[in-house]
């Protein structure tokens, strides 16, 4: 069986890892063993944080919507409830963008949510009054 010299393959692998470790501090950018450990860990963090980013942005959108809705005299939960009862299906990302950049349009959305909440409150209270008498 012929002897296999792995120098070229090993050098290419090491070069690839060291290329990924560019910008790291200290031994982690020079030594292959430290660089490999650091690159592996950085990939784990990147995988985890791609999932976390979605949660973080959703929380940010909710905070922005809540702040804008409270200025209009509603809470976030009541606003979302009113939108669903009014049949308006806009996701939180778009709602927060509208709240930040187009306040007039957002005020119209809040008004329609309030109207839907009041309409349902009036119809349910009338039904209960008839049952009590």
From Swiss-Prot:
<comment type="similarity">
    <text>Belongs to the bacterial ribosomal protein bL20 family.</text>
</comment>
<dbReference type="GO" id="GO:1990904">
    <property type="term" value="C:ribonucleoprotein complex"/>
</dbReference>
<dbReference type="GO" id="GO:0005840">
    <property type="term" value="C:ribosome"/>
</dbReference>
<dbReference type="InterPro" id="IPR005813">
    <property type="entry name" value="Ribosomal_bL20"/>
</dbReference>
<protein>
    <recommendedName>
        <fullName>Large ribosomal subunit protein bL20</fullName>
    </recommendedName>
</protein>
<dbReference type="GO" id="GO:0019843">
    <property type="term" value="F:rRNA binding"/>
</dbReference>
<dbReference type="Pfam" id="PF00453">
    <property type="entry name" value="Ribosomal_L20"/>
</dbReference>
<keyword id="KW-0694">RNA-binding</keyword>
<dbReference type="GO" id="GO:0006412">
    <property type="term" value="P:translation"/>
</dbReference>
<dbReference type="InterPro" id="IPR035566">
    <property type="entry name" value="Ribosomal_protein_bL20_C"/>
</dbReference>
<dbReference type="GO" id="GO:0003735">
    <property type="term" value="F:structural constituent of ribosome"/>
</dbReference>
<keyword id="KW-0699">rRNA-binding</keyword>
<keyword id="KW-0687">Ribonucleoprotein</keyword>
<dbReference type="GO" id="GO:0000027">
    <property type="term" value="P:ribosomal large subunit assembly"/>
</dbReference>
<keyword id="KW-0689">Ribosomal protein</keyword>
<dbReference type="InterPro" id="IPR049946">
    <property type="entry name" value="RIBOSOMAL_L20_CS"/>
</dbReference>
<comment type="function">
    <text>Binds directly to 23S ribosomal RNA and is necessary for the in vitro assembly process of the 50S ribosomal subunit. It is not involved in the protein synthesizing functions of that subunit.</text>
</comment>
């Amino acid at each position: 069986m012929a002897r296999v010299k792995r120098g070229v393959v090993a050098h290419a692998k090491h070069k690839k890892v060291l290329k990924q470790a560019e910008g790291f501090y200290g031994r982690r950018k020079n030594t292959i063993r430290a660089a490999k450990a650091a690159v592996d860990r950085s990939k784990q963090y990147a995988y985890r944080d791609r999932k976390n980013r979605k949660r973080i942005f959703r929380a940010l959108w909710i905070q922005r919507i809540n702040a804008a809705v409270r200025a209009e005299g509603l809470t976030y939960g009541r606003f979302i409830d009113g939108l669903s009862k009014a049949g308006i299906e806009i996701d939180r990302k778009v709602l927060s963008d509208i709240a930040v950049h187009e306040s007039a349009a957002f005020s119209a959305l809040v008004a329609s949510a309030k109207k839907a909440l009041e309409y349902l409150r009036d119809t349910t209270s009338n039904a209960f009054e008839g049952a009590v008498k």
